């Protein structure tokens, strides 16, 4: 037998059979595990992860160095708005296709009508970028499942046909030998009585029935053996499950980062409010102390004025009493001196 052709992995350049390499980037199983395809935490586009700590694509890393951390886009809510309030994808789509419309899947106003060419790929639905990616991923998975089922069915049918071909010559030879025996012994059977002929027919019918019962017992063994297509499909499904897990982990990391940012923003707002409250309390206490000092000074001044007025009133009363007494003395003296 000729040796099967080997193909090089695009990452480690080691040679493997074609079935062991991935369909898209022709990577081996070890490279797929070491460098999985994950989604960027900012722009949500898929890229090959160089290290486990790297969760941002090269383009977003350059933009972070140049413009700083991005903000969420006002249309798609993806944290990729490095310049302004819109991400680069939404700005380009708005220039090309007009204002955004509501997505039929996520109900957000972030879907751009790409006319017939774009809708033809998603069965005539108006979807945003993230929803189109998820829809295409589901379609790809269903196609792969159908292919794996078809390959397993074809391999099982081909193996059963080869097994039948192996048994067919023996059966033909047995049938030819049986026919020769039947033709040679036909002359002998013709000389037998009808009862003996009936017994011979029963024996031949039993032997043929035993042969028919023995042949199907061998088929389940062949069907129980897994074909190469099934094993490769199982490996592909396991690899796709691993990539899905990495995607889920990156999504969870993104959610954790967004929640941390929200917590930081809320903490900052709480600190600012606390500062304002302390400033207002200090101002209130200062104003209250000033008012109290003013009230005390006014009360003291009022008491002093009241005391002064009371003292003056007393003096005036004394003067009035003295004047009234002097008048009385003057009147009595004038009465005594008169004849």
Swiss-Prot record:
What positions are modified (Phosphothreonine)? Answer: 215
* UniProt feature, compositional bias: Low complexity: 148-160
Primary residence: nucleus
Basic and acidic residues: bias regions: 215-224
Record carries keyword Phosphoprotein: yes
* Basic residues compositional bias, start-end: 167-189
Which GO molecular function entries does the Swiss-Prot or TrEMBL record give?
A: RNA binding
Q: Where in the cell is it found?
A: Nucleus speckle
For domains, the record's comment is: The basic polyhistidine region acts as a targeting signal to nuclear speckles.
Job of this protein? Negatively regulates the NF-kappa-B-mediated inflammatory pathway by preventing the translocation of HNRNPA2B1 from the nucleus to the cytoplasm. Inhibits the PI3K/Akt/NF-kappa-B pathway-mediated polarization of M1 macrophages by binding to and stabilizing PIK3CD mRNA, resulting in increased levels of PIK3CD protein and increased levels of phosphorylated downstream target AKT which leads to decreased NF-kappa-B signaling.
Q: What is this protein called?
A: Protein FAM76B
